[in-house]
Amino acid sequence: MTKVYANSIQQERVVDRIALLERCLDPSNSLPTAKRLVAVAVATILAVALLVVAGLLFSGVLCSPVSVLAASLFFGVGAFLLGGALVGGVLTTEAVTRERLHRSQTLMWNNLCCKTAEVEQKISTASANAKSNDKTRKLGE
């Protein structure tokens, strides 16, 4: 009797794990993270580029405006392009990491399904044994 109860508790835990894995495997759950990452990266690029341009423009106003203005635009555009390359690298790394995570979760899912099938087989075997024991008891009485 206690084995059947323990098996039902184990089966409930397996069902909870399956539900958790289904939520993890849902690709729509990872989209907000990528969107937030893009927004933060673009804001950082713009802030760095604008700070470089503003600093150089301020020094250009104090010194010689034409040459420093050209330099500030050059450095601002350079900072923006460098930031864009950095963000591209970060997003590529994030996409690869998410893909690897999804693949490992899929493997975990397959492993869990195999374990669940084994648990269900053990439970059905235990219930069949319990039924046969009940039949033998009835015959013995």
UniProtKB/Swiss-Prot annotation:
Disulfide bonds: none annotated. Keywords: Host membrane, Membrane, Secreted, Transmembrane, Transmembrane helix, Virulence. Its main location: secreted. It comes from the Bacteria. The chain crosses the membrane at residues 38-58, 68-88. It is a multi-pass membrane protein. Pfam families: IncD. It is found in: Secreted; Host vacuole, Host pathogen-containing vacuole, Host pathogen-containing vacuole membrane. InterPro entries: IncD. One of its GO terms (cellular component) is host cell membrane. The keyword Transmembrane applies. Inclusion membrane protein probably involved in early modification events of the chlamydial inclusion. This is Inclusion membrane protein D. It comes from Chlamydia trachomatis serovar D (strain ATCC VR-885 / DSM 19411 / UW-3/Cx). The lineage of its organism: Bacteria, Pseudomonadati, Chlamydiota, Chlamydiia, Chlamydiales. The gene is incD.
